[in-house]
């Protein structure tokens, strides 16, 4: 047996022994009838204590004689004879406990406390004081075991280092890694901040179907499920767009939804098949109004959550404080591929030649607009590091957007990029029912030609438009990618609590 295999075998034996010992301790607690008590109540979390009392000296704390009750997971323990120090972790952070044998009821220290294990969940009462090193601590007068942990913490509090294990066992990741806990706290703050921002602007939050008979609102491959009661195949939604615009037809002039979308596509550092989007629709507005809204939203969130408008992402500082750059798609191609002759982007054969020269395989079903879009994505997208709006998307790749009044080959649409990736997509909505019907037919033709991401024909949506959709603008923002930016995370799995993973066999 190799040394590495021997070490692995020893580790398994050690773990099995520890599991056995912990279960024996639980069995003993069951015999005493105190295995899982539920009558302990805390009155502070660790962050509340630090916020209120870190600034006070020990003499002041002793004079105040403050008694508190806390609860959390025992992360470290230093036993020094008749006294010990414990690090207790709760939702707010950590607080130190000072546990002395003579200050607890008889037998608690030796017969109970010293037999508890790291990872156990404790309740503690006592008085606040500061150690000689100035650390805020609780001098315990009561200490109880609330939950017996049957498994040890990962690597004895050095954190869960295996990346895949962090995703599969997120609970261990959250116990062990401060960075992960902070990421998901920021995510929650972002969601709350978006909701507050939208309400302040007069928007109403709504909910639309997650299962749809006709998937629509985006070009993507859907997941299929079956409704037993209706004996009907249905699709997990790829976007809520068409339902939200039905609500605008119905008279709700400013609506938004934050919810999950599902797309049966690949998994990468930027893509998870189940992801969170915020979509909004605003009557009597155009795409320019939503450019302003998007810029204001990101600036507001950065200031409110991070306390500044400069955000560090990798080795780049993203500046949300200054006006965001605005380029047309063709301007971006020219900027990042200067040798491009702009006239070539108006000709199918010339554009196809450019695309093929930079390694793009041109599908038979693509028209000029799709080719130009693919060229943009290949030569420009990765360079859009600072916040940038790209406008003038071809109508061919924008089946739901309003055509431009001057040039009907392009639409009044923008995509929003930060850090070299798309974060948001917005446009003036197509409210011409006849034009929409024809574009749906074009999408059906593309699907018949082999494009499995082309849209279905949605007859009811066309009927809704025939009742009259006011001039409207819509916007979708990827929440997961937004969280990645605000937390300096470089894979989408780091910002989704339970990302899609292949099952372990």
Curated annotation (Swiss-Prot):
SUPFAM superfamilies hit by this protein: Class II aaRS and biotin synthetases, Nucleic acid-binding proteins
Chain sites annotated for binding Mg(2+) 1: 415, 422
UniProt keyword annotations, A-Z: Acetylation, Aminoacyl-tRNA synthetase, ATP-binding, Cytoplasm, Ligase, Magnesium, Metal-binding, Nucleotide-binding, Protein biosynthesis
Annotated EC: 6.1.1.6
Stored PANTHER family: LYSINE--TRNA LIGASE, CHLOROPLASTIC_MITOCHONDRIAL (PTHR42918:SF15), LYSYL-TRNA SYNTHETASE (PTHR42918)
Sequence similarity: Belongs to the class-II aminoacyl-tRNA synthetase family.
UniProt-recorded name of the protein: Lysine--tRNA ligase
The keyword GTP-binding is annotated on this UniProt entry: no
Key word Repeat present: no
Chain positions found as N6-acetyllysine: 114, 156
Binding site for Mg(2+) 2: 422
Encoding gene per record: lysS
Assembly and interaction partners: Homodimer.
Reactions catalysed according to its record: tRNA(Lys) + L-lysine + ATP = L-lysyl-tRNA(Lys) + AMP + diphosphate
Cellular compartments annotated: Cytoplasm
GO molecular function: ATP binding; lysine-tRNA ligase activity; magnesium ion binding; tRNA binding
